[in-house]
Amino acid sequence: MRVGYGYDVHRLQEGRRLVLGGVEIPHMQGLLGHSDADVLLHAICDALLGAAALGDIGQHFPDSDSQYKDINSLLLLKEVAGILQRAGWRVINVDSTVVAQEPRLAPHIKQMRQNIARVLAIESEQVSVKATTTEGLGFAGRQQGISAHAVVLIEQA
């Protein structure tokens, strides 16, 4: 068994969609990035790749490659799942936290969990998505960006 940890952060910007865990969330700002900037899925991808010692999201999906421009990060997670499977690993669980002052994420967490579980071919009970604020402190508190942390457990298949 191996544990992996992932972290991602993106800047908030008007005129962009806010996508977290593959769910489009109504908000006046979205996350700026080369892909859809889904910080939650990016953190999970990095955690999975790190646990298997298979690099990181930037190595596999560089922002210099136009094929990943505005790509749905669920597709990136699906590719990461395939990379792990081909290397002989399977996912036991995912535990993640999104750090955002706004918007309120609780109404969307069930769908995020289902999306992640579906792509990883595990049960939604094996996926935890939590949300927290920074009580107005730092870049998240000033609503300049959103970050996500993820921890995963994998084992040889």
UniProtKB/Swiss-Prot annotation:
The keyword Cell division does not apply. It catalyses: 4-CDP-2-C-methyl-D-erythritol 2-phosphate = 2-C-methyl-D-erythritol 2,4-cyclic diphosphate + CMP. It is an enzyme of class 4 (lyase). PROSITE patterns: ISPF. Pathway: Isoprenoid biosynthesis; isopentenyl diphosphate biosynthesis via DXP pathway; isopentenyl diphosphate from 1-deoxy-D-xylulose 5-phosphate: step 4/6. The record marks 34, 133 as: Transition state stabilizer. Keywords: Isoprene biosynthesis, Lyase, Metal-binding. Its EC number is 4.6.1.12. One of its GO terms (biological process) is terpenoid biosynthetic process. Coiled coil: none annotated. 4-CDP-2-C-methyl-D-erythritol 2-phosphate binds at residues 8-10, 34-35, 56-58, 61-65, 132-135, 139, 142. Homotrimer. Belongs to the IspF family. This is 2-C-methyl-D-erythritol 2,4-cyclodiphosphate synthase. It comes from Syntrophomonas wolfei subsp. wolfei (strain DSM 2245B / Goettingen).
